[in-house]
Amino acid sequence: MSQDGSIRRTPEEAADRANQLIQGTFAGVLGMEFTLLSSDRVEATLKVRQEHKQPWGILHGGAVMTLADTVAGAGAYMNLAPGQETVTVELKINLIGAVREGVIRAEATPLHRGKPTSIW
């Protein structure tokens, strides 16, 4: 861990630490797992479980959206100065395919890094 107590380490170490930190949170309860976490790229996975599905057996869009929000938020966090916080201002998704089983993967890279906002 860095001196300021943050999770800023190697991308793999940061992902391991983030996986510990999300235990007991919404992302952790859903079963998300970070695989890479850096200021330039974030990757995470979610193994589809029955409780992630809508009544018709398809992965719920809210689970997909939560995974997307989580990786984007983690990327924004990795670019903050110590003591700063981040929240999602806007989030949009187009779901163009159905998933019934397996593992979904999300990756985020920065499109814009500004002082008040960033786009991932």
Language-model features and meaning:
Residues 1-120:
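Terminal targeting signals and extreme-terminal segments of soluble enzymes
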